[in-house]
Design a protein with these regions (language model features):
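Sec-dependent bacterial lipoprotein signal peptides
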Residues: 1-19
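A structural "domain/chain start" motif
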Residues: 2, 20-73, 174-185
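Generic marker of residues within folded, mature protein domains
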Residues: 11, 17, 35, 89, ...
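Surface-exposed short loop/turn segments
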Residues: 22-30, 82, 86-152
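Short secondary-structure boundary motifs at beta->alpha junctions and helix caps
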Residues: 57-64, 125-179
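Extracytoplasmic/secreted envelope proteins and their assembly/folding machinery
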Residues: 68, 72-79, 159-162, 166
């Protein structure tokens, strides 16, 4: 069975469109400043699955793949480099920070806007100490042709959100330095 030239071209184009257009995001946010205060405790970091919202306010963003593992590694790397806590890992620590992240893509004035929302709960054992919410936006290009057109603003918005979150946590340092697990009476 021999395929016509038109069919071959169509199948090739279909393969390229279905595989070549997905922007696989890799981020490595870096702290822009040293911590305002340090907390001499170990920190366990856990993340919920990433939520994505596209320009049409529906779940998911067309042609964008941001693996949970990459987001986790990006946040862990940022927290380790910042140096607020004595150690940061996914293993049990003195404190536990659970983060839920959401990326919202919108289009305004012919430019894409990338908003990262972080909801974080700080715990000591199973007891909630404090919750945090931060939202930061970075402006991208007018078109999403290449992966970098998504990656750069996503990384910038994530970095700003992490800076804001850590600033709030560092401001509350006395909560975490003085907090001890209370035994049930």
């Amino acid at each position: 069975m021999r395929l016509s030239t038109r069919r071959r071209v169509f199948l090739l184009a279909l393969c390229l469109v279905s595989t070549g257009c997905v922007h696989r995001i890799h981020v490595a946010p870096v702290p822009t400043s040293a911590p305002s205060n340090t907390i001499p405790r170990s920190l366990q970091v856990t993340l919920s699955p990433l939520a994505l919202e596209g320009p049409d306010h529906r779940p998911g963003i067309t042609f964008l793949d941001w693996p949970h593992r990459d987001l986790t590694q990006g946040i862990l790397g940022y927290l380790r480099q910042r140096g607020t806590f004595s150690s940061v890992s996914q293993e049990a620590g003195d404190l536990s920070l659970h983060v839920a992240a959401k990326l919202v893509l919108s289009s305004r004035r012919d430019l894409y806007h990338y908003r990262v929302i972080l909801e974080a709960d700080m715990r000591d054992a199973s007891q909630l100490i404090k919750s945090y919410l931060t939202e930061q936006t970075a402006v991208g290009s007018s078109i999403r042709w290449v992966t970098a057109s998504d990656r750069r603003p996503i990384e910038a918005a994530l970095q700003l959100a992490l800076e804001d979150l850590m600033g709030k946590i560092e401001t509350d340092r006395l909560l975490y330095r003085n907090h001890t697990t209370r035994s049930p009476s």
